[in-house]
From Swiss-Prot:
GO terms for molecular function: L-aspartate oxidase activity; nucleotide binding. NCBIfam families: nadB, PRK07512.1. It comes from Xylella fastidiosa (strain Temecula1 / ATCC 700964). Its main location: cytoplasm. Its cofactor is FAD. Belongs to the FAD-dependent oxidoreductase 2 family. NadB subfamily. It comes from the Bacteria. Keywords: Cytoplasm, FAD, Flavoprotein, Nucleotide-binding, Oxidoreductase, Pyridine nucleotide biosynthesis. FAD binds at residues 17-20, 46-53, 361, 377-378. This is L-aspartate oxidase.
Length: 512
Protein backbone atom coordinates (compact mmCIF):
# COMPACT_ATOMS: atom_id res chain seq x y z
CA UNK A 1 0.00 0.00 0.00
CA UNK A 2 1.35 3.41 -0.95
CA UNK A 3 2.36 5.73 1.88
CA UNK A 4 0.75 9.18 1.89
CA UNK A 5 3.38 11.90 2.38
CA UNK A 6 1.57 14.91 3.83
CA UNK A 7 4.58 17.10 4.54
CA UNK A 8 4.55 18.40 0.95
CA UNK A 9 0.76 18.63 0.70
CA UNK A 10 -0.55 21.09 -1.88
CA UNK A 11 2.86 22.17 -3.08
CA UNK A 12 3.13 22.25 -6.88
CA UNK A 13 4.66 19.00 -8.14
CA UNK A 14 6.94 19.12 -11.17
CA UNK A 15 7.60 15.77 -12.85
CA UNK A 16 10.80 15.76 -14.88
CA UNK A 17 14.16 17.52 -14.64
CA UNK A 18 14.87 18.52 -18.21
CA UNK A 19 14.93 22.16 -19.27
CA UNK A 20 11.18 22.76 -18.91
CA UNK A 21 11.02 21.19 -15.45
CA UNK A 22 14.10 22.98 -14.11
CA UNK A 23 12.96 26.36 -15.42
CA UNK A 24 9.48 25.80 -13.96
CA UNK A 25 10.85 25.00 -10.50
CA UNK A 26 13.09 28.06 -10.51
CA UNK A 27 10.22 30.26 -11.71
CA UNK A 28 7.82 29.00 -9.01
CA UNK A 29 10.42 29.87 -6.36
CA UNK A 30 10.22 31.26 -3.70
CA UNK A 31 6.92 29.39 -3.36
CA UNK A 32 7.86 25.87 -2.19
CA UNK A 33 7.60 23.14 -4.81
CA UNK A 34 8.53 19.48 -5.26
CA UNK A 35 10.53 18.31 -8.27
CA UNK A 36 10.32 14.56 -8.96
CA UNK A 37 12.83 12.78 -11.18
CA UNK A 38 13.32 9.05 -11.75
CA UNK A 39 17.09 9.42 -11.98
CA UNK A 40 19.63 11.99 -10.83
CA UNK A 41 18.55 15.60 -11.28
CA UNK A 42 19.04 16.63 -14.90
CA UNK A 43 20.23 13.17 -15.98
CA UNK A 44 18.52 10.99 -18.59
CA UNK A 45 16.89 14.00 -20.22
CA UNK A 46 16.82 14.90 -23.89
CA UNK A 47 17.55 18.51 -22.90
CA UNK A 48 20.96 17.54 -21.56
CA UNK A 49 21.80 15.89 -24.87
CA UNK A 50 20.82 18.83 -27.09
CA UNK A 51 23.75 19.82 -29.27
CA UNK A 52 22.47 22.67 -31.40
CA UNK A 53 21.22 25.32 -29.01
CA UNK A 54 18.24 27.69 -28.81
CA UNK A 55 16.75 29.75 -31.62
CA UNK A 56 16.44 33.51 -31.09
CA UNK A 57 16.57 36.42 -33.54
CA UNK A 58 19.60 38.50 -32.56
CA UNK A 59 21.48 39.41 -35.75
CA UNK A 60 20.87 42.73 -37.57
CA UNK A 61 19.39 40.93 -40.59
CA UNK A 62 16.97 38.85 -38.50
CA UNK A 63 13.72 39.48 -36.62
CA UNK A 64 10.87 37.51 -34.98
CA UNK A 65 8.76 37.75 -38.15
CA UNK A 66 11.41 35.87 -40.14
CA UNK A 67 11.75 33.33 -37.33
CA UNK A 68 7.97 32.84 -37.34
CA UNK A 69 7.91 32.44 -41.12
CA UNK A 70 10.57 29.71 -40.93
CA UNK A 71 8.66 27.99 -38.11
CA UNK A 72 5.38 28.01 -40.04
CA UNK A 73 7.08 26.76 -43.20
CA UNK A 74 8.69 23.84 -41.36
CA UNK A 75 5.37 23.08 -39.62
CA UNK A 76 3.85 22.41 -43.04
CA UNK A 77 0.48 24.04 -42.50
CA UNK A 78 -0.32 22.65 -39.06
CA UNK A 79 1.22 25.20 -36.69
CA UNK A 80 -1.08 27.24 -34.50
CA UNK A 81 0.17 30.55 -35.88
CA UNK A 82 -1.03 32.58 -32.90
CA UNK A 83 0.61 30.23 -30.39
CA UNK A 84 3.80 30.10 -32.44
CA UNK A 85 4.04 33.86 -32.72
CA UNK A 86 3.50 34.34 -28.99
CA UNK A 87 6.31 31.91 -28.13
CA UNK A 88 8.73 33.36 -30.69
CA UNK A 89 8.06 36.90 -29.45
CA UNK A 90 9.31 35.74 -26.03
CA UNK A 91 12.54 34.25 -27.42
CA UNK A 92 14.63 37.24 -26.36
CA UNK A 93 13.17 37.03 -22.85
CA UNK A 94 14.01 33.31 -22.76
CA UNK A 95 17.57 34.11 -23.81
CA UNK A 96 17.90 36.62 -20.96
CA UNK A 97 16.36 34.14 -18.49
CA UNK A 98 19.09 31.63 -19.29
CA UNK A 99 21.75 34.32 -18.98
CA UNK A 100 20.28 35.26 -15.59
CA UNK A 101 20.81 31.69 -14.40
CA UNK A 102 24.48 31.80 -15.34
CA UNK A 103 24.58 30.42 -18.87
CA UNK A 104 27.31 32.00 -21.00
CA UNK A 105 26.68 31.59 -24.70
CA UNK A 106 29.54 31.20 -27.16
CA UNK A 107 31.11 34.28 -28.72
CA UNK A 108 33.17 34.73 -31.86
CA UNK A 109 36.71 36.12 -31.99
CA UNK A 110 35.31 39.66 -31.95
CA UNK A 111 33.36 39.13 -28.76
CA UNK A 112 30.00 38.95 -30.50
CA UNK A 113 27.51 36.13 -30.00
CA UNK A 114 28.33 33.18 -32.24
CA UNK A 115 25.11 32.38 -34.09
CA UNK A 116 24.74 28.97 -35.72
CA UNK A 117 22.75 28.08 -38.83
CA UNK A 118 20.55 24.99 -38.86
CA UNK A 119 18.21 23.32 -41.31
CA UNK A 120 15.23 25.33 -42.60
CA UNK A 121 16.36 28.53 -40.84
CA UNK A 122 16.78 31.48 -43.22
CA UNK A 123 19.18 33.24 -40.86
CA UNK A 124 21.89 32.38 -38.37
CA UNK A 125 19.97 32.47 -35.08
CA UNK A 126 21.10 29.52 -32.95
CA UNK A 127 22.83 30.52 -29.71
CA UNK A 128 24.96 27.71 -28.32
CA UNK A 129 27.27 26.85 -25.45
CA UNK A 130 30.59 25.04 -25.66
CA UNK A 131 30.25 24.43 -29.38
CA UNK A 132 27.96 21.41 -29.39
CA UNK A 133 27.53 21.09 -25.60
CA UNK A 134 24.56 23.44 -25.29
CA UNK A 135 22.17 21.05 -23.60
CA UNK A 136 24.72 19.72 -21.15
CA UNK A 137 25.92 23.18 -20.18
CA UNK A 138 22.42 24.63 -19.77
CA UNK A 139 21.10 21.70 -17.73
CA UNK A 140 24.20 21.65 -15.51
CA UNK A 141 23.84 25.37 -14.76
CA UNK A 142 20.12 25.12 -14.00
CA UNK A 143 20.60 21.97 -11.93
CA UNK A 144 23.09 23.83 -9.73
CA UNK A 145 20.57 26.65 -9.30
CA UNK A 146 17.82 24.21 -8.30
CA UNK A 147 20.04 22.42 -5.79
CA UNK A 148 20.96 25.75 -4.23
CA UNK A 149 17.34 26.89 -3.93
CA UNK A 150 15.91 25.96 -0.50
CA UNK A 151 12.32 26.34 -1.72
CA UNK A 152 12.68 23.42 -4.16
CA UNK A 153 12.51 19.89 -2.73
CA UNK A 154 14.09 17.38 -5.12
CA UNK A 155 12.95 13.75 -4.96
CA UNK A 156 15.35 11.63 -7.00
CA UNK A 157 14.90 7.99 -7.91
CA UNK A 158 11.09 8.06 -7.93
CA UNK A 159 9.01 7.39 -11.02
CA UNK A 160 5.57 8.93 -11.50
CA UNK A 161 3.10 6.09 -12.13
CA UNK A 162 -0.42 7.51 -11.80
CA UNK A 163 -2.21 10.87 -11.58
CA UNK A 164 -4.80 10.72 -8.81
CA UNK A 165 -8.19 12.24 -9.62
CA UNK A 166 -11.27 13.14 -7.57
CA UNK A 167 -14.39 14.60 -9.18
CA UNK A 168 -12.48 15.02 -12.46
CA UNK A 169 -9.76 17.23 -10.97
CA UNK A 170 -6.19 16.47 -9.95
CA UNK A 171 -5.69 15.59 -6.29
CA UNK A 172 -2.31 13.85 -6.12
CA UNK A 173 0.44 11.81 -7.70
CA UNK A 174 1.42 8.18 -7.11
CA UNK A 175 5.17 7.55 -7.21
CA UNK A 176 7.22 4.39 -6.95
CA UNK A 177 10.70 2.91 -7.03
CA UNK A 178 11.83 -0.70 -6.52
CA UNK A 179 11.49 -0.46 -2.73
CA UNK A 180 8.69 1.99 -1.98
CA UNK A 181 5.43 3.56 -3.11
CA UNK A 182 4.30 7.02 -2.02
CA UNK A 183 1.45 9.42 -2.69
CA UNK A 184 1.97 13.17 -2.82
CA UNK A 185 -1.33 15.01 -2.28
CA UNK A 186 -1.50 18.05 -4.57
CA UNK A 187 -4.00 19.87 -6.74
CA UNK A 188 -1.22 21.23 -8.98
CA UNK A 189 0.92 18.95 -11.15
CA UNK A 190 3.21 20.02 -13.98
CA UNK A 191 4.32 17.27 -16.34
CA UNK A 192 7.68 17.92 -17.99
CA UNK A 193 8.33 14.28 -18.79
CA UNK A 194 9.88 14.57 -22.24
CA UNK A 195 9.34 12.63 -25.42
CA UNK A 196 8.56 9.18 -26.76
CA UNK A 197 11.79 8.11 -28.46
CA UNK A 198 12.18 5.07 -26.20
CA UNK A 199 9.34 3.43 -28.15
CA UNK A 200 11.75 3.05 -31.10
CA UNK A 201 14.81 0.86 -31.51
CA UNK A 202 16.65 3.71 -33.25
CA UNK A 203 16.39 6.82 -31.09
CA UNK A 204 18.52 9.70 -29.91
CA UNK A 205 16.45 10.02 -26.71
CA UNK A 206 17.11 8.46 -23.31
CA UNK A 207 15.83 4.92 -23.78
CA UNK A 208 13.46 5.10 -20.81
CA UNK A 209 11.61 8.09 -22.28
CA UNK A 210 8.58 6.42 -23.84
CA UNK A 211 5.97 9.08 -23.10
CA UNK A 212 5.10 8.22 -19.49
CA UNK A 213 3.57 11.64 -18.92
CA UNK A 214 1.37 11.22 -21.98
CA UNK A 215 0.25 7.78 -20.80
CA UNK A 216 -0.64 9.07 -17.34
CA UNK A 217 -2.51 12.07 -18.71
CA UNK A 218 -4.33 9.89 -21.25
CA UNK A 219 -5.49 7.53 -18.50
CA UNK A 220 -6.75 10.57 -16.57
CA UNK A 221 -8.82 11.66 -19.58
CA UNK A 222 -6.70 14.49 -20.98
CA UNK A 223 -7.09 15.62 -24.58
CA UNK A 224 -4.15 14.64 -26.80
CA UNK A 225 -3.13 16.43 -30.02
CA UNK A 226 -1.07 15.72 -33.15
CA UNK A 227 0.19 12.37 -31.85
CA UNK A 228 1.08 11.09 -35.32
CA UNK A 229 3.92 13.55 -35.80
CA UNK A 230 7.22 12.00 -34.73
CA UNK A 231 10.32 13.78 -35.94
CA UNK A 232 13.17 11.54 -37.00
CA UNK A 233 16.51 13.28 -36.84
CA UNK A 234 18.14 12.59 -40.21
CA UNK A 235 21.67 12.16 -38.95
CA UNK A 236 22.11 9.90 -35.96
CA UNK A 237 25.48 8.17 -35.74
CA UNK A 238 24.80 4.79 -37.36
CA UNK A 239 26.19 2.11 -35.05
CA UNK A 240 25.02 -0.67 -32.71
CA UNK A 241 24.58 1.55 -29.66
CA UNK A 242 21.24 2.45 -28.08
CA UNK A 243 20.46 5.27 -27.88
CA UNK A 244 22.17 6.52 -31.00
CA UNK A 245 24.37 9.58 -30.73
CA UNK A 246 23.16 12.69 -32.49
CA UNK A 247 25.22 14.31 -35.23
CA UNK A 248 23.88 17.83 -35.00
CA UNK A 249 22.32 19.69 -37.90
CA UNK A 250 24.85 22.38 -37.14
CA UNK A 251 27.45 20.18 -38.88
CA UNK A 252 25.45 20.52 -42.09
CA UNK A 253 25.04 24.20 -41.30
CA UNK A 254 28.83 24.47 -41.47
CA UNK A 255 28.85 22.94 -44.95
CA UNK A 256 29.02 19.15 -44.48
CA UNK A 257 27.25 17.18 -47.23
CA UNK A 258 25.35 13.88 -47.38
CA UNK A 259 26.64 11.16 -49.68
CA UNK A 260 25.72 7.54 -50.32
CA UNK A 261 28.06 4.56 -50.52
CA UNK A 262 28.82 5.48 -54.15
CA UNK A 263 29.93 8.96 -53.12
CA UNK A 264 26.86 10.57 -54.70
CA UNK A 265 25.48 13.72 -53.10
CA UNK A 266 21.83 12.64 -53.29
CA UNK A 267 20.42 15.80 -51.65
CA UNK A 268 22.01 18.17 -54.17
CA UNK A 269 18.92 18.57 -56.38
CA UNK A 270 16.38 18.78 -53.55
CA UNK A 271 15.34 22.33 -52.56
CA UNK A 272 17.35 23.30 -49.51
CA UNK A 273 19.73 20.39 -50.11
CA UNK A 274 21.33 19.25 -46.83
CA UNK A 275 19.60 22.12 -45.00
CA UNK A 276 16.09 21.19 -46.08
CA UNK A 277 13.57 20.58 -43.29
CA UNK A 278 14.30 17.53 -41.16
CA UNK A 279 11.40 15.47 -42.50
CA UNK A 280 12.63 15.91 -46.08
CA UNK A 281 16.20 14.96 -45.24
CA UNK A 282 15.12 12.00 -43.07
CA UNK A 283 12.84 10.65 -45.79
CA UNK A 284 15.57 10.96 -48.43
CA UNK A 285 18.08 9.14 -46.23
CA UNK A 286 15.50 6.48 -45.36
CA UNK A 287 14.87 5.89 -49.06
CA UNK A 288 18.61 5.39 -49.67
CA UNK A 289 18.84 2.88 -46.80
CA UNK A 290 15.64 1.08 -47.85
CA UNK A 291 17.13 0.37 -51.29
CA UNK A 292 20.07 -1.29 -49.50
CA UNK A 293 22.45 1.64 -49.54
CA UNK A 294 24.46 3.44 -46.89
CA UNK A 295 24.53 7.14 -46.06
CA UNK A 296 27.40 9.26 -44.75
CA UNK A 297 27.83 12.84 -43.59
CA UNK A 298 31.03 14.17 -45.12
CA UNK A 299 32.61 17.16 -43.37
CA UNK A 300 36.14 16.64 -44.62
CA UNK A 301 36.16 19.47 -47.13
CA UNK A 302 33.88 21.88 -45.26
CA UNK A 303 35.54 21.63 -41.85
CA UNK A 304 38.58 19.39 -42.00
CA UNK A 305 40.80 19.89 -38.96
CA UNK A 306 38.37 22.48 -37.54
CA UNK A 307 35.80 19.75 -36.88
CA UNK A 308 37.22 18.74 -33.51
CA UNK A 309 37.21 22.29 -32.11
CA UNK A 310 33.78 23.26 -33.45
CA UNK A 311 32.18 19.93 -32.52
CA UNK A 312 34.15 18.37 -29.65
CA UNK A 313 31.26 16.23 -28.37
CA UNK A 314 30.51 14.76 -31.78
CA UNK A 315 34.21 14.15 -32.34
CA UNK A 316 34.44 12.17 -29.10
CA UNK A 317 31.30 10.17 -29.95
CA UNK A 318 32.71 9.32 -33.37
CA UNK A 319 36.05 8.27 -31.92
CA UNK A 320 34.25 5.82 -29.60
CA UNK A 321 33.00 3.87 -32.62
CA UNK A 322 36.22 4.14 -34.62
CA UNK A 323 35.35 7.10 -36.84
CA UNK A 324 37.68 10.08 -37.34
CA UNK A 325 35.40 12.83 -38.73
CA UNK A 326 38.39 14.94 -39.77
CA UNK A 327 39.49 12.29 -42.26
CA UNK A 328 36.45 10.01 -42.66
CA UNK A 329 32.79 10.46 -43.59
CA UNK A 330 30.40 9.76 -40.70
CA UNK A 331 27.86 6.92 -41.17
CA UNK A 332 24.37 8.24 -40.36
CA UNK A 333 20.75 7.10 -40.28
CA UNK A 334 17.39 8.58 -39.19
CA UNK A 335 16.37 8.04 -35.55
CA UNK A 336 13.33 9.01 -33.50
CA UNK A 337 14.28 12.35 -32.03
CA UNK A 338 11.36 14.61 -31.13
CA UNK A 339 7.60 14.29 -30.75
CA UNK A 340 5.59 17.23 -32.04
CA UNK A 341 2.40 15.76 -30.59
CA UNK A 342 1.49 15.30 -26.96
CA UNK A 343 -0.91 16.53 -24.31
CA UNK A 344 -2.92 19.45 -25.69
CA UNK A 345 -2.29 22.68 -23.78
CA UNK A 346 -3.42 26.28 -23.92
CA UNK A 347 -1.15 29.34 -23.95
CA UNK A 348 -0.42 28.94 -20.23
CA UNK A 349 0.42 25.25 -20.37
CA UNK A 350 -2.93 24.12 -18.95
CA UNK A 351 -4.23 20.74 -20.10
CA UNK A 352 -7.92 19.88 -20.41
CA UNK A 353 -7.80 18.51 -16.84
CA UNK A 354 -8.11 21.04 -14.00
CA UNK A 355 -4.89 21.00 -11.99
CA UNK A 356 -2.69 19.49 -14.71
CA UNK A 357 -0.15 21.61 -16.59
CA UNK A 358 2.30 20.36 -19.22
CA UNK A 359 5.49 21.92 -20.63
CA UNK A 360 8.28 20.85 -22.94
CA UNK A 361 8.16 17.92 -25.33
CA UNK A 362 5.28 16.18 -23.51
CA UNK A 363 3.00 19.07 -24.51
CA UNK A 364 1.42 19.93 -27.83
CA UNK A 365 1.27 23.73 -27.94
CA UNK A 366 0.85 24.21 -31.68
CA UNK A 367 4.33 25.73 -32.11
CA UNK A 368 5.77 22.85 -34.12
CA UNK A 369 2.87 21.77 -36.31
CA UNK A 370 3.70 18.77 -38.46
CA UNK A 371 7.46 19.22 -38.21
CA UNK A 372 9.60 21.04 -35.64
CA UNK A 373 12.03 23.71 -36.76
CA UNK A 374 15.49 22.92 -35.40
CA UNK A 375 16.34 24.42 -31.98
CA UNK A 376 12.78 25.62 -31.36
CA UNK A 377 12.41 22.92 -28.70
CA UNK A 378 14.72 24.55 -26.14
CA UNK A 379 12.97 27.85 -26.81
CA UNK A 380 9.56 26.29 -26.21
CA UNK A 381 10.78 24.57 -23.04
CA UNK A 382 11.96 27.84 -21.50
CA UNK A 383 8.94 29.91 -22.56
CA UNK A 384 6.27 27.35 -21.68
CA UNK A 385 8.02 26.16 -18.52
CA UNK A 386 8.04 29.78 -17.36
CA UNK A 387 4.42 30.43 -18.35
CA UNK A 388 3.10 27.26 -16.74
CA UNK A 389 5.00 27.98 -13.53
CA UNK A 390 3.59 31.49 -13.29
CA UNK A 391 0.09 30.19 -13.91
CA UNK A 392 0.48 27.47 -11.28
CA UNK A 393 1.35 30.02 -8.61
CA UNK A 394 -1.99 31.76 -9.21
CA UNK A 395 -3.97 28.55 -8.64
CA UNK A 396 -4.24 26.67 -5.37
CA UNK A 397 -7.54 25.02 -4.54
CA UNK A 398 -6.74 21.90 -2.50
CA UNK A 399 -8.84 18.81 -3.17
CA UNK A 400 -9.13 15.80 -0.85
CA UNK A 401 -7.51 12.59 -2.04
CA UNK A 402 -9.77 10.19 -3.84
CA UNK A 403 -9.33 6.44 -4.08
CA UNK A 404 -5.68 5.38 -4.28
CA UNK A 405 -5.30 2.63 -6.88
CA UNK A 406 -2.95 -0.31 -6.81
CA UNK A 407 0.43 0.92 -8.01
CA UNK A 408 0.87 0.12 -11.71
CA UNK A 409 3.81 -2.12 -12.58
CA UNK A 410 7.06 -0.55 -13.73
CA UNK A 411 6.66 0.14 -17.45
CA UNK A 412 8.62 -1.98 -19.92
CA UNK A 413 8.91 -1.18 -23.63
CA UNK A 414 10.54 -4.48 -24.66
CA UNK A 415 7.46 -5.94 -26.35
CA UNK A 416 6.29 -2.63 -27.82
CA UNK A 417 9.47 -1.38 -29.51
CA UNK A 418 9.50 -3.92 -32.36
CA UNK A 419 5.89 -3.07 -33.24
CA UNK A 420 6.50 0.67 -33.26
CA UNK A 421 9.85 0.45 -35.06
CA UNK A 422 8.50 -1.75 -37.84
CA UNK A 423 5.08 -0.13 -38.32
CA UNK A 424 5.34 3.54 -37.31
CA UNK A 425 8.69 4.67 -38.65
CA UNK A 426 9.79 7.30 -41.16
CA UNK A 427 7.68 5.84 -43.98
CA UNK A 428 4.21 4.50 -43.13
CA UNK A 429 1.50 2.44 -44.82
CA UNK A 430 -2.06 1.50 -43.86
CA UNK A 431 -1.26 -2.22 -43.72
CA UNK A 432 1.56 -1.64 -41.22
CA UNK A 433 -0.59 0.64 -39.09
CA UNK A 434 -3.43 -1.92 -39.01
CA UNK A 435 -0.95 -4.53 -37.79
CA UNK A 436 0.28 -2.14 -35.11
CA UNK A 437 -3.25 -1.38 -33.88
CA UNK A 438 -4.16 -5.07 -33.68
CA UNK A 439 -0.92 -5.91 -31.87
CA UNK A 440 -1.04 -3.00 -29.42
CA UNK A 441 -4.65 -3.13 -28.27
CA UNK A 442 -4.28 -6.30 -26.12
CA UNK A 443 -1.29 -4.72 -24.35
CA UNK A 444 -3.24 -1.51 -23.68
CA UNK A 445 -6.08 -3.44 -22.09
CA UNK A 446 -3.85 -5.93 -20.29
CA UNK A 447 -2.69 -3.64 -17.44
CA UNK A 448 0.77 -5.21 -17.42
CA UNK A 449 4.29 -3.77 -17.74
CA UNK A 450 3.71 -3.04 -21.42
CA UNK A 451 0.42 -1.21 -20.90
CA UNK A 452 1.60 2.40 -20.62
CA UNK A 453 4.08 2.20 -23.53
CA UNK A 454 1.34 0.51 -25.56
CA UNK A 455 -1.07 3.37 -24.81
CA UNK A 456 1.33 5.93 -26.27
CA UNK A 457 2.09 3.72 -29.26
CA UNK A 458 -1.62 3.12 -29.93
CA UNK A 459 -2.28 6.86 -29.80
CA UNK A 460 0.40 7.40 -32.45
CA UNK A 461 -0.95 4.55 -34.59
CA UNK A 462 -4.58 5.70 -34.56
CA UNK A 463 -3.74 9.35 -35.18
CA UNK A 464 -1.44 8.27 -38.03
CA UNK A 465 -4.04 5.93 -39.50
CA UNK A 466 -6.61 8.73 -39.60
CA UNK A 467 -4.31 11.16 -41.41
CA UNK A 468 -4.63 9.97 -45.00
CA UNK A 469 -1.97 12.26 -46.43
CA UNK A 470 1.74 12.92 -46.19
CA UNK A 471 2.49 16.08 -44.26
CA UNK A 472 5.59 17.12 -42.36
CA UNK A 473 7.05 14.25 -40.38
CA UNK A 474 4.08 12.00 -41.23
CA UNK A 475 4.94 10.31 -44.53
CA UNK A 476 2.64 7.65 -46.00
CA UNK A 477 3.67 5.62 -49.00
CA UNK A 478 -0.01 4.87 -49.74
CA UNK A 479 -0.98 8.55 -49.49
CA UNK A 480 2.09 10.44 -50.77
CA UNK A 481 0.28 13.75 -51.41
CA UNK A 482 -0.96 16.49 -49.09
CA UNK A 483 -4.60 17.47 -48.79
CA UNK A 484 -5.42 21.00 -49.94
CA UNK A 485 -6.87 21.74 -46.51
CA UNK A 486 -6.00 20.19 -43.20
CA UNK A 487 -6.44 20.62 -39.48
CA UNK A 488 -4.96 19.51 -36.20
CA UNK A 489 -6.63 16.55 -34.52
CA UNK A 490 -7.55 16.31 -30.83
CA UNK A 491 -8.75 13.10 -29.15
CA UNK A 492 -8.88 11.39 -25.79
CA UNK A 493 -7.78 7.84 -25.03
CA UNK A 494 -11.45 6.86 -24.89
CA UNK A 495 -11.90 8.13 -28.46
CA UNK A 496 -8.83 6.24 -29.63
CA UNK A 497 -9.89 2.95 -28.03
CA UNK A 498 -13.30 3.20 -29.67
CA UNK A 499 -11.69 3.76 -33.08
CA UNK A 500 -9.20 0.94 -32.53
CA UNK A 501 -11.94 -1.58 -31.74
CA UNK A 502 -13.92 -0.35 -34.75
CA UNK A 503 -10.96 -0.74 -37.13
CA UNK A 504 -10.19 -4.24 -35.89
CA UNK A 505 -13.84 -5.26 -36.27
CA UNK A 506 -13.88 -3.88 -39.82
CA UNK A 507 -10.75 -5.83 -40.73
CA UNK A 508 -12.25 -9.04 -39.39
CA UNK A 509 -15.39 -8.48 -41.46
CA UNK A 510 -13.32 -7.97 -44.62
CA UNK A 511 -11.31 -11.11 -43.98
CA UNK A 512 -14.43 -13.21 -43.33
Amino acid sequence: MAKIVDCFADRPIIVGSGLAGLIAALTISPEPSVLVTRSALGAETSSAWAQGGMSVSLSPDDNPSLHLADTLAAGDGLCDAVAAESIILEALDAFHVLQHFGIHFDQDSNGHLALGLEAAHSRRRIVHVGGDRSGTAIVQALTACVLNDPSITVLEGLEARHILMADNVVCGLLLANPTSEIVLPSSRILLATGGIGGLYDATTNPVNNFGQGIAMAARAGAVLADMEFVQFHPTALHCHNRPLALVSEAVRGEGAVLINERGERFMADIPGAELAARNIVAQAISAEITRGGQVFLDARQALGARFSTRFPTITALCHKVGIDPVHMPIPVCPAAHYHMGGIATDRQGRSSIPGLWVAGEAASTGLHGANRLASNSLLEAVVMGTRAARDITSHNTPHPLGTIPITPKKPDTTLIRPIVSQCLGVLRHAADMHRAIAALLPFVEGEEESSDPAIVALLIAIFAHLRTESRGAHARTDFPLKHDTTQRRNMTLEDVLEIAHSRIAQRKEKIS
